[in-house]
């Protein structure tokens, strides 16, 4: 609704420390500053945006990074103190001296290979053999997959499908596995739905639907 983003000024402004510079942290910092609070935002990395910035590295998605640029301008206008490359542990947070602390550090991807579609397997058999990477690690170029890659598209959204598209455009031979009836199943209500699957097919990706990964050897997978 119009005016829904307007904030009433606080009658007793406080100092606030916000830890984490992803989109959630940026919005929390903006909202608090709009209400008149004195806000310091600490981000462990060298840039604001968190995982959202990685999403902007996927093909045809660079425009979403305009949101991060907008937040940076808003925080500057609202005089939010932004500290990059600033990791804060519990002791540092406790001694910072802020009236209020907001934690917006997000979460890390699981390292077990757990699949909701195969809930009886708490961990992917063979994951200790290595060469299993998160989408975040791939997009951040912290992981370097080989020529042939299996992508598990369990959530059916941009995280899996967009990362697969990036890998395919980089020349990798892809097999995309999903427990759903189609790749990117949760994107059916968006304009990207059909064009995404068509582009992946054009790039030679193989689709394996209504399936999961039963076992990983380090070089090959057993698919149900």
For each predicted feature, which ranges?
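A short, basic/flexible loop-to-alpha-helix module at the beginning of a structural domain
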Residues: 1-16, 133-147
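Beta1/beta-strand and adjacent pyrophosphate-binding region of the FAD-binding site
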Residues: 11-24, 145-157
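N-terminal Rossmann-like FAD-binding beta1-loop-alpha1 element of flavoenzymes
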Residues: 16-40, 160-168
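Glycine-rich FAD pyrophosphate-binding loop
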Residues: 37-51, 172-184
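A Rossmann-like FAD-binding core segment of flavoenzymes
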Residues: 65-111, 127-128, 134-140, 144-147, ...
């Amino acid at each position: 609704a119009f005016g829904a983003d307007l904030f009433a000024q606080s009658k007793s402004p406080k100092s606030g420390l916000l830890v984490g510079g992803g989109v959630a942290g940026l919005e929390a910092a903006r909202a608090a500053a709009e209400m008149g609070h004195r806000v310091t935002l600490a981000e462990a990395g060298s840039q604001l945006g968190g995982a959202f910035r990685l999403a902007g590295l996927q093909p045809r998605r660079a425009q979403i990074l305009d949101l991060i640029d907008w937040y940076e301008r808003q925080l500057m206008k609202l005089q939010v103190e932004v500290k990059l490359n600033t990791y804060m542990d519990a002791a540092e947070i406790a001694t910072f001296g802020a009236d209020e602390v907001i934690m917006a550090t997000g979460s890390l991807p699981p390292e077990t290979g757990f699949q909701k579609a195969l809930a009886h397997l708490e961990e992917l058999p063979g994951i200790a053999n290595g060469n299993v990477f998160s989408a975040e690690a791939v997009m951040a170029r912290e992981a370097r997959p080989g020529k042939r890659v299996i992508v598990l598209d369990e959530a059916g959204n941009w995280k899996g499908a967009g990362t697969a598209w990036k890998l395919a455009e980089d020349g990798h031979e892809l097999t995309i596995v999903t427990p759903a009836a189609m790749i990117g199943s949760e994107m059916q209500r968006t304009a990207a739905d059909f064009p995404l699957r068509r582009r992946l097919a054009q790039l030679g990706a193989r689709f394996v639907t209504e399936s999961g990964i039963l076992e990983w050897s380090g070089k090959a997978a057993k698919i149900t």
